[in-house]
């Protein structure tokens, strides 16, 4: 059975210990005792076939602490994990002691109260800088491969959003609950894995907090080498498909008969004759005179040719006549 180390941090009195007790014992503590250091251990069942990307896990969260994905659906195909929960003190007196439990942590939970803006502001002003300085969150595979910190942001005391006394108190202080828009912007800007809300008093969303934390902890992102290999294979397949289609097009072009682009070969005979008749423009008067001149010139050339032929013929002489007469026989 794989063991998951989960460390919970956040301001004092935001409900970290109450969250852990509510999850492990199904009860809500009524007395507040500041935590110095405590450790809880339990077994959690996670359905097989985790999401292929952390974004899919986050999309299953309705932002109010209930997952609509595989965590809430009944399934017999589950895998057991041992989750070790490390509770820490949020007071400044323990700033030097607290980082001793950070090494080899699989997932961090940074908690804040949805009704206290000061605890929400400390997420980026105190807790994230402390983790960067005293832990190895920037050396995890999630950060090196995805640019995401192994951190789940948790809003506690979600039941106070509908509490009239808390609403009145916030109005008197000219304040309000931490809005969902503020939370989404912080998660995106800081590179957290996701966000969820819960209430230890009503146990709403408590179980889903740790199921989601385990999913993030066991998620194994694709390495850059695997991505490069997959992209290379995809490019090769695309190139091969393109070349095959190109060769096919060339063969089809070679098999097609050659067509002349001239107008005479593309137009039908009837339409070609009509087009020629339409383009046959009647000659002008000047053109008629030129035609008559050409005809007379042609006749004159024929007469001249006949005269020349007659001149070349030899005329008969007197001697020729005498020779004919001398042929007569005298009896």
UniProtKB/Swiss-Prot annotation:
Residues 287-297 have a biased composition (Basic and acidic residues). Residues 329-331 form a propeptide. GO terms for molecular function: GTP binding; GTPase activity; protein kinase binding. It is found in: Membrane; Mitochondrion. It comes from the Eukaryota. A lipid is attached at residue 328 (S-geranylgeranyl cysteine). Belongs to the small GTPase superfamily. Rho family. This is GTP-binding protein RHO5. It comes from Saccharomyces cerevisiae (strain ATCC 204508 / S288c).
């Amino acid at each position: 059975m794989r063991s998951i180390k989960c460390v919970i941090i956040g301001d004092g009195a935001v409900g970290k210990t109450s969250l852990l007790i509510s999850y492990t014992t199904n009860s809500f503590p009524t007395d507040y005792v500041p935590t110095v250091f405590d450790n809880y251990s339990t077994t959690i069942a996670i359905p097989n076939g985790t999401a292929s990307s952390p974004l899919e896990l986050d999309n299953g969260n309705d932002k109010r602490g209930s997952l609509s994905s595989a965590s809430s659906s009944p399934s017999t195909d589950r895998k057991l994990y041992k989750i070790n929960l490390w509770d820490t003190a949020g007071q400044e007196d323990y700033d030097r002691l607290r980082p001793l439990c950070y090494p080899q942590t699989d997932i961090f939970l940074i908690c804040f109260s949805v009704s206290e803006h000061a605890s929400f502001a400390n997420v980026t002003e105190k807790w994230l800088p402390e983790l960067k300085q005293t832990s190895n969150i920037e050396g995890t595979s999630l950060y090196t491969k995805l640019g995401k910190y192994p951190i789940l942001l948790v809003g506690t005391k979600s039941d106070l959003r509908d509490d009239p006394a808390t609403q009145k108190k916030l109005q008197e202080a000219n304040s309000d609950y931490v809005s969902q828009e503020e939370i989404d912007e912080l998660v995106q800007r800081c590179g957290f894995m996701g966000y969820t809300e819960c209430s230890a008093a009503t146990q709403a969303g408590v179980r889903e907090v740790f199921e989601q934390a385990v999913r993030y902890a066991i998620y194994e992102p694709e390495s850059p080498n695997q991505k490069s290999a997959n992209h290379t294979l995809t490019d090769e397949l695309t190139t091969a498909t393109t070349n095959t289609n190109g060769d096919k097009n060339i063969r089809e072009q070679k098999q097609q008969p050659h067509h002349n682009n001239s107008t005479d070969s593309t137009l039908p005979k009837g339409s070609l004759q009509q087009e020629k008749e339409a383009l046959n423009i009647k000659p002008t008067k000047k053109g008629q005179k030129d035609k008559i001149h050409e005809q007379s010139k042609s006749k004159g050339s024929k007469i001249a040719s006949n005269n020349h032929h007659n001149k070349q013929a030899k005329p008969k002489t007197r001697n020729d006549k005498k020779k004919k007469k001398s042929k007569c026989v005298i009896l």
